[in-house]
Amino acid sequence: MFSFFRRKKKQETPAPEEAQIQETVAKVESEVAQIVENIKEDAESLAESVKGQVESAVETVSGAVEQVKETVAEMLSEAEEAAEKAAEQVEAAKEAVAETVGEAVGQVQEAVATTEEHKLGWAARLKQGLTKSRDKMAKSLAGVFGGGQIDEDLYEELETVLITSDMDMEATEYLMKDVRDRVSLKGLKDGNELRGALKEALYDLIKPLEKPLVLPETKEPFVIMLAGINGAGKTTSIGKLAKYFQAQGKSVLLAAGDTFRAAAREQLQAWGERNNVTVISQTTGDSAAVCFDAVQAAKARGIDIVLADTAGRLPTQLHLMEEIKKVKRVLQKAMPDAPHEIIVVLDANIGQNAVNQVKAFDDALGLTGLIVTKLDGTAKGGILAALASDRPVPVRYIGVGEGIDDLRPFDARAFVDALLD
C-alpha cells in the first residue's frame, strides 16, 4: 500500500523538459504582458500627444478665425470711415466748386461792369480831349446846322468849315460829295439835318483807319519800332504803350534807341521804373546796336513785346533817314521777321503836314501803323480825314491827354461822335 502511494507521487512530479517549457512559457507570457503594457502606455502617450496637438490646432484655428474676424471688422470699420470721409469730401468739393463758380461769375460780371465803365470813361475823356476841335467846328457849323434850306450857299459854308479844320482838299471833296449823295438819297431839306449826313460821311471816310493792333500768339518777342520827329511824343507814347500792354498781361522790354539825346534815355528809364519794365540802353553807341541788344535780351528772357525807341528826325534829313533804315535792317538780323510793327508817332498840332511826314516815313520804312498824339491840344481834328484820303495807314492809337491811360486804340465811331456831337 505504501508502495502504491510512493509510485503515484513520483508520477505527478514534472519532467525536467516540461519544467523548462513551463518556465519559458511563463517568461514569454511575462514578456508579452510587458510588451502589451508598453504598447498600452505608448498608445496612451500617443493619444495624449495627438489630443494635445489636436487641441492646439483647434486653438490655433480658433485664434486665427478670431483674428480674421477682428481684421475684417477693422477693415469694415475703416471702410465705413473712409466712405464717410469721402462723402464729406464730395460735399466739401461741391460747396467749393459752387463757391468758385459763384466767385468766377461775380468776377466776370465785375469785369464786364468795369469794362463798360472803362468804355464810358474813355468816351468821356475822348470827348473832353477833342474839346478844342469840337468847339471850333461847332462854332463854325452853327450857321450851317442852324436851320434854313439846304442849298449851294449852305454847301459852300460847310466846305469852308471842313477845309479850315485841316481836312485837305481831297478829303473835303470826298466828304462834300458823300454829303450831297446822302442828302439827295434821303431827300433831306433842312440844314439841321446835315449834321447826321456829315457824321456818317466822316465815319465812312476814317473807318478804314480803325485797325487795332493784334498781337500774335507766339513764343518769340513781338518787336515794335517807333519813329517820328522830335517833340511828337514818341518816348511818352512808348511809356504809355508799355502800361497798356502790361494791362493785357504781356511782359514788355524797352529799347532806348534815341542815342542822340541823353534826356530821351533818361525819360525812357523813368517810364521803365514807373512801369517796372527793363530798359536796355547804352551811354555810347548807335541806335541800331541798342535795338539789337534789346531784341537779344528779350529772346533770352522770354519777353512778349519789345518797344524800340529811335532818335527823332525830320524826313528832309536824308542822312538820318538812312540811319533809321539801318535800324530796321539790324532788327531784321536780330530776328528775321522783325520789326513786326513800324509805327510813326504824329503830333496832331502839325495839321496837314502830318500827311507829308507819313508819306516820307512810309516810303523809307514801310509803315504798318500810326499813333496820333496831342489831339487834346489842337483844334485840328480833321487831320485823320486828311490821312484817310491821302495815305490811309492804320491809326493804331490816339492820345488825348497827359494821363498814362490817355493813349487808347483808335475807334472811328467814338472819334466822330466826340468830334461832332
Swiss-Prot record:
It catalyses: GTP + H2O = GDP + phosphate + H(+). It is a peripheral membrane protein. Residues 1-10 have a biased composition (Basic residues). Residues 1-22 are annotated as: Disordered. GO terms for molecular function: ATP hydrolysis activity; GTP binding; GTPase activity; signal recognition particle binding. One of its GO terms (cellular component) is cytoplasm. GTP binds at residues 228-235, 309-313, 373-376. NCBIfam families: ftsY (TIGR00064). Involved in targeting and insertion of nascent membrane proteins into the cytoplasmic membrane. Acts as a receptor for the complex formed by the signal recognition particle (SRP) and the ribosome-nascent chain (RNC). Interaction with SRP-RNC leads to the transfer of the RNC complex to the Sec translocase for insertion into the membrane, the hydrolysis of GTP by both Ffh and FtsY, and the dissociation of the SRP-FtsY complex into the individual components. Part of the signal recognition particle protein translocation system, which is composed of SRP and FtsY. SRP is a ribonucleoprotein composed of Ffh and a 4.5S RNA molecule. This is Signal recognition particle receptor FtsY. The gene is ftsY.
